[in-house]
């Protein structure tokens, strides 16, 4: 596996771990990694989103 691929895999794992921590706090927020733009997208309660992520989710 290339260094870049390994880095993406590590980031995906980190996001998954963070999502698990959030789920335990019952925030109902799900994180997943989208490959096309390499963006972290947050799905869940809109009131829990930071302004930066809210801007990213507007299409």
Swiss-Prot record:
Main location: secreted
GO CC list: extracellular region
Signal peptide: 1-19
Subcellular location: Secreted
Keywords from the named record: Amidation, Cleavage on pair of basic residues, Neurotoxin, Secreted, Signal, Toxin
Note: The mature peptide does not contain cysteine residue.
Family according to the record: Belongs to the FARP (FMRFamide related peptide) family.
The name this protein goes by in its record: Conorfamide-Ep1
Species of the source: Conus episcopatus (Bishop's cone)
